Amino acid sequence: MESRLARLTTLQVTAGDNLRRTSIIGTIGPKTNNPEVLVALRKAGLNIVRMNFSHGSYEYHQSVIENARKSEELYPGRPLAIALDTKGPEIRTGTTTGEVDYPIPPNHEMIFSTDEKYAKACDDKVMFVDYANITKVISKGKIIYVDDGVLSFEVLEVVDGKTLKVKSLNAGKICSHKGVNLPGTDVDLPALSEKDKADLRFGVKNGVHMVFASFIRTAQDVLTIREVLGEDGKDIKIVVKIENQQGVNNFDEILKVTDAVMVARGDLGIEIPAPEVLAVQKKLIAKSNLAGKPVICATQMLESMTYNPRPTRAEVSDVGNAILDGADCVMLSGETAKGNYPINAVTTMADTALIAEQAIAYQPLYDDLRNLTPKPTSTTETVAASAVAAVYEQKAKAIIVLSTSGTTPRLVSKYRPDCPIILVTRNPRAARFSHLSRGVFPFVYEADSVADWTEDVELRLKFGIEKAIEMGVMKKGDTYVSIQGFKAGEGHSNTLQVSNA
């Protein structure tokens, strides 16, 4: 069996003609919100469209959804998934008097107040903060960050129920409507603001496939979101964004109830010391891998490509190392939303992923995942893991999975086969959200069901084989592994077969 070190000594240094297994998420903004550009992004490697609900009107987001669907008409290809990223509960400062900025020096003492009379009258003496309980949760000596850490303050005194006395730790400007972070302080904000609830209802109505849920702190936050999505949104996948210390502390419980995870390093790097984000990223990805929950790595991955046609070497290493850590997906934000080189950014990410994936020693990784997964596993997971074992023993070229719900291909992906996973499904939603799982290539089988179950299975397998051959994954005579159910419906994928194309 090839070790990781042995693998690295024979690593190809070019992308070659391999199939990329890591999915790419791109935020859609003014530079990319039209069908033709979306087609170009998809051809470059985009799998999931992200809408950032911190910005834009419903009319704008509606246009993104419509343009994404038009791009599929122009370029059928594989299904495109659409994600709604919530704004999330947040703390912000008020409006400055006259809407002007007020400079402050280091060691400047001032007041933070929750009194509404200062909401539109902030200056260098008093700053309004819209979190009523801030005086209850914070204590003397704690740090407060404003404007993503551009300004730092130390709490000198909790004066009363509405007032904090603080001291600036650096020079800066007091500006309107800036975000506030309370690192090391547990806050009791609700899981969803009223805006978030309305946004989720918009997502349900318009058929989004997944929700990226911001600032998740507890497992109950996830259950609250599921409740708001309701019966009509029961098939929407929830991807929790871990971006504060509470989320990190409660991650094990959160992981049990979420569908997938995003390591959102932007706010996380404000809430905890930046060097610690490295360890947190690796830990959360590893735990997600073991749980078989897809995991996304996000924020500033190719930030310089917002304005430059080429990335920094550090950015390329960041993308590659996230994939080596075990990320199923990597994400672009401003690079595709407002950047000057959105297609270049996706192409760069795709090329980097291809090379990074070649550095993975897949069989030792499979052994680790199998050995560390608690037993007994479900029947579906046992079959999924056995399919991957069969791939290594038979040197199979592909795993073809016939699935209704999309659960089986996700569990096959967990065990990281060194070949593509071809998903054949009649469920378009399952095809779309399967992009969250590394190595899954979804195809929607549109032919009507055949009354004879065995014949129907054979027809779908034939379809999967044809797609694998079209992709160049295998040729006639090659060995493949297949998983299918013994009868119709969800939850019956327990039949494994090794065959030749």
Curated annotation (Swiss-Prot):
**Domain of life per record:** Eukaryota
Q: Which UniProt keywords apply?
A: ATP-binding, Glycolysis, Kinase, Magnesium, Metal-binding, Nucleotide-binding, Potassium, Pyruvate, Transferase
Residues that coordinate or bind K(+)? 52, 54, 85-86
Residues flagged as site, Transition state stabilizer: 241
Pathway connected to this protein: Carbohydrate degradation; glycolysis; pyruvate from D-glyceraldehyde 3-phosphate: step 5/5
- According to its UniProt record, the EC number is 2.7.1.40
Required co-factor? Mg(2+); K(+)
**Cellular component GO terms, alphabetical:** cytoplasm
Q: Where does this protein hold Mg(2+)?
A: 243, 267
Pfam assignment, any one: PK
Which parts of the sequence bind substrate?
Answer: 50, 266-267, 299
Q: Which reactions is this enzyme annotated as catalysing? A: pyruvate + ATP = phosphoenolpyruvate + ADP + H(+)
Return the broad EC class.
transferase
**SUPFAM superfamilies, per the entry:** Phosphoenolpyruvate/pyruvate domain (SSF51621), PK beta-barrel domain-like (SSF50800), PK C-terminal domain-like (SSF52935)
Q: How does it assemble?
A: Homotetramer.
Q: Which family does it belong to?
A: Belongs to the pyruvate kinase family.
Query: What is the protein's given name?
Result: Pyruvate kinase
Q: State the species of origin.
A: Naumovozyma castellii
Name the gene for this chain: PYK1
